[in-house]
Amino acid sequence: MIKRVLTALAATLLPLGAHAADAITGAVQRQPTNWQAIVMFLIFVALTLYITYWASKRVRSRSDYYTAGGNITGFQNGLAIAGDFMSAASFLGISALVYTSGYDGLIYSLGFLVGWPIILFLIAERLRNLGRYTFADVASYRLKQGPIRTLSACGSLVVVALYLIAQMVGAGKLIQLLFGLNYHVAVVLVGVLMVLYVLFGGMLATTWVQIIKAVLLLCGASFMAFMVMKHVGFSFNNLFTEAMAVHPKGAAIMSPGGLVKDPISALSLGLGLMFGTAGLPHILMRFFTVSDAKEARKSVFYATGFMGYFYILTFIIGFGAIMLVGANPAFKDAAGQLIGGNNMAAVHLADAVGGNLFLGFISAVAFATILAVVAGLTLAGASAVSHDLYANVFRKGATERQELKVSKITVLILGVVAILLGILFENQNIAFMVGLAFSIAASCNFPIILLSMYWSKLTTRGAMVGGWLGLLTAVILMILGPTIWVQILGHEKALFPYEYPALFSIAIAFIGIWVFSATDNSPEGMREREQFRAQFIRSQTGIGIERGQAH
């Protein structure tokens, strides 16, 4: 009984993970050049470059660059967060998962949402009241600035680097798939555009790129879902009946549990994605773009609504693809497989319901999706270097101008590194990188953010030991696990049997923080505990926070 409950829980928690990561790592067959898609995409690029130009005229200070001056509303920020979080892997990956496995796809898509109530109830308000530009501002509020900011920046940069590699390789593969462009050209194109957005437009341009992309993605997905439902007379019963009639698995597509093999791995990945969401630097950074805690709370509310709606749409799109794409020989190759692989299910459905023009629109939106995500990641990485490391550790008292200069140099370096890594990892299995990024965010960033805000006995010693332990455990266990040790390094048997380390590394991080804080009797530790009350009052009331300035 317990095993069944565990498996069910794991199935609910285990979102996209390796399966949907296939959307960005699966077999790719280059498609013929799609001119409609290229024209639509060029229109999107022209619009976003104009926004970057407009934003660059308004970026006058450090606050403008990192947080858009704190002038973004809760609704706008909610849309931007949704735009930052709904990746191409979730659009193409989940619909492909539903196309192949049916009901299981819904379980996976809902898993992505599980982390958001944690952010809403535990983190959003206090984070906004205590921080200015990065989550390290919050973690180091009453702890020692140097060591804590160094740890937070390292955690952020590792997460950003891993996530960025996955997105860049995904971008290259996807563009090769959708547009028929060369992989290297695609990676360079994404890298250059990402640098332009962030270098000149800062957070303001990044926010609007994410908002536009979210609106386009939601509109495109809504139209596809509407056309699918129209085809079946707006009856879910007809949708499922027709899908079961044409799917090779028949009625089995309506039963759950086919994708979860090992409850521990599933639970571990589920926890990693759930708590990792609350430790992703580019997501946490978005809470400083609003004026106060109330707007921060609204942001999460709207973001969760948009994402929940989007994942329901992907479910309808997946079943629509079974019915309209799976049963249509025009979308199959000579071997009876879907042209371009299963990850093209949603793209073929766009062709089936809206013709070539709509196919071009959806292809362009899929590319825009990646651009929005990498822009947010780059800005988070740059702020970790310039604000946390340069201005608060290496060169205390640096002027705003010097800090911004370092930030912009970092953006350029990150752009070059992202392009090189994207080309280097072209043929590698990058599915594990998203899982590892979330595991590190959950094992290093999340425990420190949570306990610094809620646990009065936390000290610098505990945070440092626990944070580094969590980060190193996540990386070491991932290397010793089946993905890297067996598949990439070629050993016969993995030293660590589970694919994802989060269950173990999160536990080690929390235990490490608790043990080393509880046993810290130094005068410094005592002083840090005494300062909790002042921090608590500020986190509840927001007295003294920087509010948005009118431009």
Swiss-Prot record:
Hey, what's the signal peptide range on this chain? Answer: none
Provide GO CC annotations from the record. Answer: plasma membrane
| A Gene Ontology molecular function term of the record | glycolate transmembrane transporter activity
PROSITE patterns recorded for this chain? NA_SOLUT_SYMP_1, NA_SOLUT_SYMP_2, NA_SOLUT_SYMP_3
Q: Which cysteines are joined by disulfide bonds?
A: none
Q: Which InterPro entries match?
A: Cation/Ac_symporter_ActP, Na/Glc_symporter_sf, Na/solute_symporter, Na/solute_symporter_CS, Sodium:Solute_Symporter
Keyword presence, Transmembrane: yes
Record keywords, A-Z: Cell inner membrane, Cell membrane, Ion transport, Membrane, Sodium, Sodium transport, Symport, Transmembrane, Transmembrane helix, Transport
What CDD domains does UniProt report for this protein, alphabetically?
SLC5sbd_u4
Q: How does it sit in the membrane?
A: Multi-pass membrane protein
Q: What is its main location?
A: membrane
A Pfam cross-reference name? SSF
Q: Which residues cross the membrane?
A: 8-28, 35-55, 78-98, 105-125, 151-171, 185-205, 208-228, 264-284, 305-325, 357-377, 406-426, 430-450, 465-485, 496-516
Q: In which compartments does the protein localize?
A: Cell inner membrane
Q: Name one GO biological process term.
A: plasma membrane acetate transport
Q: Which HAMAP family match?
A: Acet_symport_ActP (MF_01426)
Q: Which family does it belong to?
A: Belongs to the sodium:solute symporter (SSF) (TC 2.A.21) family.
Could you tell me which PANTHER family the record lists for this protein?
A: CATION_ACETATE SYMPORTER ACTP (PTHR48086:SF6), SODIUM/PROLINE SYMPORTER-RELATED (PTHR48086)
Its annotated function is as follows: Transports acetate.
Instruction: Quote the protein name from its UniProt record.
Output: Cation/acetate symporter ActP
